[in-house]
């Protein structure tokens, strides 16, 4: 059974997402949120609420696609991975921004709209991937992937809460009971994070999230590439009858024989998006705190980068 007619064109477009990475890496543009937010702008939105809204797009797109899929039902491994995916977004879209997180920096509307578009496409692709390219069985690769996902997920949550504790009063801290006042007064927003992998890198929450989704992808698709049917075959398929124009336009540029599975395309998109921001953020930390910032601390990979 072929996946939905929009799947391959959408996946090809999703592969183009990493092309934006050099723009951020070389500092041409910093996405206006967090430490790089524009403090005064009419296009700024409430940080906590807008974060929740843009992140909810992904699980909504995921569930909508699963419910409307032409596949009768997901197999057991795919149901487990769906549960892990939804657990991540329950925390990321609801628990973290609306319950746990202190007041966040404002989000520029361009960030929110771009994230909503990305999450819409990603949720759709991951759902189709689990439905039409499911893991075959619960073998050692699947179990190892789920264990790795669990470590990455809780590592991500733990280090996020260390950052949140920097903005909480002492009586409301969740992870750290005592924090050194490195280079900042109580009135300043940013302080030097300590604890966990922060002793070695500036962005352990990023590293843990990469581990989380790489292991999820390993459980879903141990072999990262999926075969793409030849274009003449797709054009003859009844379910693709209404998409001839779109397929023909794309084929004028490139029609691959293989593509990254949606889960691995997501990992690539995450790393290429977050790595430049980690490097830029690490430089920002060193500039702001000077000699008070640990010289041995790397940006995102201990001892390497």
Where does each model-flagged region fall?
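Juxtamembrane membrane-interface segments at transmembrane alpha-helix termini
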Residues: 94-98, 124-125, 157-158, 277-280
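Membrane-helix and juxtamembrane interface regions of eukaryotic multi-pass membrane proteins
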Residues: 1-117, 305
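Eukaryotic endomembrane system proteins
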Residues: 98-143, 150
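Hydrophobic transmembrane alpha-helices
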Residues: 1-24, 62-66, 74-75, 118, ...
């Amino acid at each position: 059974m072929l996946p939905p007619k929009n799947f391959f064109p959408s996946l090809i477009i999703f592969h183009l997402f990493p092309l934006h990475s050099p723009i951020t890496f070389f500092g041409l543009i910093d996405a206006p949120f967090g430490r790089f937010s524009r403090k005064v702008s009419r296009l700024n939105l409430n940080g906590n609420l807008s974060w929740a809204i843009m992140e909810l797009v992904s699980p909504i797109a995921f569930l909508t696609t699963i419910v409307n899929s032409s596949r009768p039902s997901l197999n057991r491994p795919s149901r487990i991975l769906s549960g892990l995916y939804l657990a991540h977004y329950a925390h990321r879209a609801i628990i973290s921004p609306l319950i746990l997180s202190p007041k966040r920096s404002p989000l520029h509307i361009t960030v929110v709209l771009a994230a909503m578009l990305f999450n819409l496409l990603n949720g759709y692709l991951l759902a189709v991937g689990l439905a039409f390219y499911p893991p075959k069985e619960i073998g050692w690769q699947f179990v190892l992937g789920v264990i790795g996902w669990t470590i990455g997920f809780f590592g991500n949550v733990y280090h996020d809460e260390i950052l949140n504790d920097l903005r909480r009063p002492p009586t409301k801290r969740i992870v750290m009971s005592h924090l050194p006042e490195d280079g900042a007064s109580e009135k300043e927003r940013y302080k030097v994070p300590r604890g966990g992998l922060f002793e070695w890198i500036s962005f352990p929450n990023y590293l843990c999230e990469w581990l989380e989704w790489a292991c999820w992808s390993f459980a879903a698709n141990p072999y990262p590439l999926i075969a793409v049917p030849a274009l003449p075959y797709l054009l003859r398929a009844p379910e693709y009858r209404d998409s001839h124009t779109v397929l023909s336009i794309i084929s004028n540029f490139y029609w691959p024989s293989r593509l990254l599975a949606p889960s691995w395309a997501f990992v690539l998109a995450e790393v290429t998006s977050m790595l430049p921001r980690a490097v830029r953020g690490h430089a920002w930390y060193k500039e702001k705190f000077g000699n008070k910032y640990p010289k041995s601390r790397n940006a995102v990979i201990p001892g390497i980068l």
